[in-house]
């Protein structure tokens, strides 16, 4: 985007009114130091374009199980295999660090997330996740009803959320100040509708919406919600309050990288209902760390790091009469090696399978094209001090949102440390919600470090006029395939079901197969597929 003016760049990502106001203020750089970090887009494009290598005959190794992909699903599969007493496997990860969109970073100030940054406290029914958190030392036993008790230091501390609107910060994410009686009536009606679905059970006693998705009801009354968007569902009920629509839209952009017009009504209701135990109670408390879900990544990685090969890519999976040949190279596409596996757990997205699984290259299954991914820009801003706060403002929270901004705002990495003064790191999230995911990826990648720094700083400057003087470093990560998009018709269409079926000796395990890109889903599919593969070898 080097040929565009500052105003044109700001208008493209923040809208014309913000761009015009910013240019009138004439608060252009100086810029802080920083860079674009992270994912190997160049190597991924080489795979897409048909990278081919030959493995020398003396560079082959036999191993029962190969796991392709070191995100949460792949790491969970490795964790489960080891807990089950199975240690003869190899995990291949292209990047120099595991975790996928749950990875994290650190500097002299604090550790910080590069993507996913919390999980809701699990309910007792999620036995495996409760077991993991107990192993991590996060839990302190059970309450009288058998629900896990999370240690206070791991729960998101107050204040949790605030929203910026017309020059002031307010508590919470729904904009209560200035709400009309009609706004309030519609909010109450929306919550009543949610209560009905939270209470709902099918003939087998299953909830309509719960975590993980694999335990949700597939009753026709529930799956019918996937045929319309959440905006259409709201319109049918007269729920058109601008504040309410914005709040639901924010939720969809936050969890799915999609707008209310794009998001399936099933997915929209899932967001609000799956984390609530019963009507009238708060959503499950949030578990978080300074580095977000990177804490879980580090725990899982440490459990099996001697079986993980980082900076190594699986470039071809060749199904044989018995087993699979896995061709791997380093990040430069050199040093080819081969693994002869009895089973492969493909813990990478379906769009990669069409380039890596040899039979898919010439004749990819129809379902592969149904998996669409959203693009995100995540930036970490290292500040020498906190932005100034007006006495009338609600104080700095963990999650800080700008009303009517296309961004999601930022989380504060030092919040869990209990430090409310001095240096900090703000993690800023910007989902690209274009209707066409390819256009979104093009916009993401065409904007360089300077453009993204200008977008984020201009956006934040509305709430923090002193932000530019406080930023010491501004680093960017561009996620071209950040998360699956649960668009209308996808959740209960055929693609997820077909994508989950093994192809000969290749078993698929990625959060996309649940339709929503949440930690619980990646954990669940990694667990289930690892057990499926383990039992197949017994």
Indicate where each model-derived feature is located.
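Extreme N-terminal leader/targeting segments of oxidoreductases
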Residues: 2-64, 83
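Conserved flavin/dinucleotide-binding core of flavoenzymes
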Residues: 25-54, 166, 172-178, 323, ...
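Glycine-rich Rossmann-fold phosphate-binding loop(s) that bind the pyrophosphate
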Residues: 69-71
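N-terminal Rossmann-fold NAD(P) dinucleotide-binding loop
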Residues: 74
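Glycine-rich FAD pyrophosphate-binding loop
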Residues: 82-105
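Dinucleotide-binding Rossmann-like beta1-alpha1 core, especially the glycine-rich loop
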Residues: 109-197
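Active-site/ligand-binding neighborhood in enzyme catalytic cores
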Residues: 202-323
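Mid-domain catalytic core of redox enzymes
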Residues: 310-425, 463
